[in-house]
Amino acid sequence: MKCVVFTGGGTGGHIFPGLAVAEALSSSLECRIVWIGSAKGVDRKIVESSELYSASPSVLEFIGIPAGKLRRYFSFQNFIDVFKVAAGFIKSFFILLKLKPVFVFSKGGFVSVPPCAAAKFLKIPVITHECDFSPGLATRINSKFANRILVSYQETAELLPASLRSKVICTGNPVRLSFYSGRPEKGRSFLNIKSNLPVLFVLGGSLGARQLNDLISDSIEYLVKHFVVVHQIGEANMDQGQKIKEGLLKSSPEFAENYKPYPFIKKEMADVLSLSSIVVSRAGANTVWESAAAGKPMILVPLEKGSSRGDQIENAEFFKKKGSAEILLGEDVRPDIFIRLLRDLGFEENISGNERLKNMAQASAALAGEKPALVIADFLKSFFTSKNEDL
């Protein structure tokens, strides 16, 4: 059985899209998939808790390597991490030498650089994919080793050096195929919803998002009268969710059942998304593309540049420009502005006939309609039959 290598990690954002591609590839082609990630951190846990690993542990294997962080600023830790990167390269070199994979597919993150560099040294084809609107540092480095650079947005090509643009293919951002076929009735059963109110799904991420959680907390008295609020609040913030619930039981007990906090929703995510009338979330690449795959209107609250490199703002602006999202940013992240936006979107009226929401939903579905996981898997399959230089 031929082997392929996937690499990426540091956060789930660099792993979940790769797993979506791995699932699509393995469903149509018999191959062994080895994921090279960080020996420490969340990488192994995410890969080994995936549906693909659970269903076929003989198909998907995880190997950890030393990983040094790539920083854009001065830090004494950079000197230590140089040695970690070097150790990661050496280990990757011998892993690839032994496996002789057909290709190395990178989803970014600092851990992906050593395997891509080692693959280039061994003349193994490298394909890298960027989820965000602007390429991260790891992608910028890996692009120099890559045979092909896959991007989620056509405009991303213009942000790469001119010498690399001929390698770029726009595929969209891969998400699991289940997001295209979520079942609302299963979502309703999982959430135990008996109300006919629209569902407002708040995605704070697996770790939560304090600004977003506080916005919901400060708006909750209004929200529960007009929505069933499904709040993925993060494991570390469940105490806040309980306080919100307890406050409602005292102030508005007849509406308290309309607030449903969860630490993290995993297997049921596609079904809950399909039930939702609108998604309120950060603007990380995976979240916005999963919501788009489900064809949902979005209110995006991106991380500001002080807390990130600005990629979430760029993602949010792209989806707003395409008509699928509205944005709350900076001083606009306030309960009064949030509530006014929901009213402007028509949620106090009959939403079934609301043209604005329908247009936003259609715009979302159109963006993710090509099923990028399948597009990328089909492209990767070409490496099994074509000469490397032809790709």
From Swiss-Prot:
Locations listed in the record: Cell inner membrane
Entry binding sites for UDP-N-acetyl-alpha-D-glucosamine: 11-13, 176, 206, 312
Record bears the keyword Transport: no
Bilayer topology term: Peripheral membrane protein
Domain of life where this protein originates: Bacteria
EC class (word): transferase
Catalyzed reaction equations: di-trans,octa-cis-undecaprenyl diphospho-N-acetyl-alpha-D-muramoyl-L-alanyl-D-glutamyl-meso-2,6-diaminopimeloyl-D-alanyl-D-alanine + UDP-N-acetyl-alpha-D-glucosamine = di-trans,octa-cis-undecaprenyl diphospho-[N-acetyl-alpha-D-glucosaminyl-(1->4)]-N-acetyl-alpha-D-muramoyl-L-alanyl-D-glutamyl-meso-2,6-diaminopimeloyl-D-alanyl-D-alanine + UDP + H(+)
Signal sequence annotation: none
Keyword vocabulary terms for this entry: Cell cycle, Cell division, Cell inner membrane, Cell membrane, Cell shape, Cell wall biogenesis/degradation, Glycosyltransferase, Membrane, Peptidoglycan synthesis, Transferase
InterPro entries assigned to the protein according to its UniProt record, in alphabetical order: GlcNAc_MurG (IPR006009), Glyco_trans_28_C (IPR007235), GlycoTrans_28_N (IPR004276)
GO CC annotations, alphabetized: plasma membrane
Gene Ontology molecular function terms on file: UDP-N-acetyl-D-glucosamine:N-acetylmuramoyl-L-alanyl-D-glutamyl-meso-2,6-diaminopimelyl-D-alanyl-D-alanine-diphosphoundecaprenol 4-beta-N-acetylglucosaminlytransferase activity; undecaprenyldiphospho-muramoylpentapeptide beta-N-acetylglucosaminyltransferase activity
SUPFAM superfamilies per record: UDP-Glycosyltransferase/glycogen phosphorylase (SSF53756)
The enzyme's E.C. designation: 2.4.1.227
Keyword flag Repeat: no
Gene3D superfamilies the UniProt entry points to: Glycogen Phosphorylase B (3.40.50.2000)
Listed pathway(s): Cell wall biogenesis; peptidoglycan biosynthesis
GO BP of this protein: carbohydrate metabolic process; cell division; cell wall organization; lipid glycosylation; peptidoglycan biosynthetic process; regulation of cell shape
Record family assignment: Belongs to the glycosyltransferase 28 family. MurG subfamily.
Purpose: Cell wall formation. Catalyzes the transfer of a GlcNAc subunit on undecaprenyl-pyrophosphoryl-MurNAc-pentapeptide (lipid intermediate I) to form undecaprenyl-pyrophosphoryl-MurNAc-(pentapeptide)GlcNAc (lipid intermediate II).
PANTHER family xrefs: UDP-N-ACETYLGLUCOSAMINE--N-ACETYLMURAMYL-(PENTAPEPTIDE) PYROPHOSPHORYL-UNDECAPRENOL N-ACETYLGLUCOSAMINE TRANSFERASE, UDP-N-ACETYLGLUCOSAMINE--N-ACETYLMURAMYL-(PENTAPEPTIDE) PYROPHOSPHORYL-UNDECAPRENOL N-ACETYLGLUCOSAMINE TRANSFERASE 1
Protein name as catalogued: UDP-N-acetylglucosamine--N-acetylmuramyl-(pentapeptide) pyrophosphoryl-undecaprenol N-acetylglucosamine transferase
Organism, as annotated: Treponema denticola (strain ATCC 35405 / DSM 14222 / CIP 103919 / JCM 8153 / KCTC 15104)
Encoding gene (name): murG
